[in-house]
């Protein structure tokens, strides 16, 4: 699973996920990719599940880039625990996603196969996404 090797603080505040993505909103490495259309958060298991689905579809040909990294700890208190007694322990690592953010990129695969693989990955993600190419990238989301 993806997670930081070391952090300055073990736990973080929740924060707010507002606005649109100004960084990481265009294809940088591949020729086709997945772009988020709405706010959400993605955890390391979802990132890995989508990556495995894509890799199996393209039979390990081409190259896949993961453009997101879960660096925010999500905490949870144990079940049937009374309130108080401090913040819960870290349960998983997530990343807040804003509309316009590129999640995955792919190159070295023919476009029809790449679209099928990216569609499989889109089903694994918890927010609306669309497939973008270098030509269609300039469209408004």
From Swiss-Prot:
Q: GO molecular-function annotation terms?
A: rRNA binding; structural constituent of ribosome; tRNA binding
Give one GO biological process term: translation
Which gene produces this protein?
A: rplP
Tell me yes or no: is tRNA-binding among this UniProt entry's keywords: yes
Annotated SUPFAM superfamilies: Ribosomal protein L16p/L10e
Chain intervals for the UniProt region annotation (Disordered): 1-22
Q: Which InterPro entries match?
A: Ribosomal_uL16, Ribosomal_uL16_bact-type, Ribosomal_uL16_CS, Ribosomal_uL16_dom, Ribosomal_uL16_sf
Biased region (Basic residues) positions are 1-19
Recorded GO cellular component terms are: cytosolic large ribosomal subunit
Summary of subunit composition and partner proteins: Part of the 50S ribosomal subunit.
Similarity field:
Belongs to the universal ribosomal protein uL16 family.
Q: What is this protein called?
A: Large ribosomal subunit protein uL16
Keyword annotations for this protein, in alphabetical order, are: Ribonucleoprotein, Ribosomal protein, RNA-binding, rRNA-binding, tRNA-binding
Going by the entry's taxonomy, the superkingdom of the source organism is recorded as: Bacteria
Coiled-coil spans in chain: none
Q: What does this protein do?
A: Binds 23S rRNA and is also seen to make contacts with the A and possibly P site tRNAs.
């Amino acid at each position: 699973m993806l997670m930081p090797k070391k952090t300055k603080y073990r736990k973080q505040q929740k924060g707010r996920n507002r606005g649109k993505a100004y960084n990481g909103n265009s294809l940088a490495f591949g020729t086709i990719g997945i772009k988020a259309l709405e706010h959400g958060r993605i955890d390391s298991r979802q990132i890995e599940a989508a990556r495995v689905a894509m890799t199996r579809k393209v039979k390990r040909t081409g190259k896949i880039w993961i453009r997101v990294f879960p660096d925010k700890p999500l905490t949870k208190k144990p079940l049937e625990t009374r309130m108080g007694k401090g913040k819960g322990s870290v349960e998983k690592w997530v990343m807040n996603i804003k509309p316009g953010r590129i999640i995955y990129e792919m190159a070295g695969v023919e476009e029809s196969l790449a679209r099928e693989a990216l569609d499989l990955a889109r089903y694994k993600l918890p927010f609306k996404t669309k497939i973008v190419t270098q030509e269609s990238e300039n469209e408004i989301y």
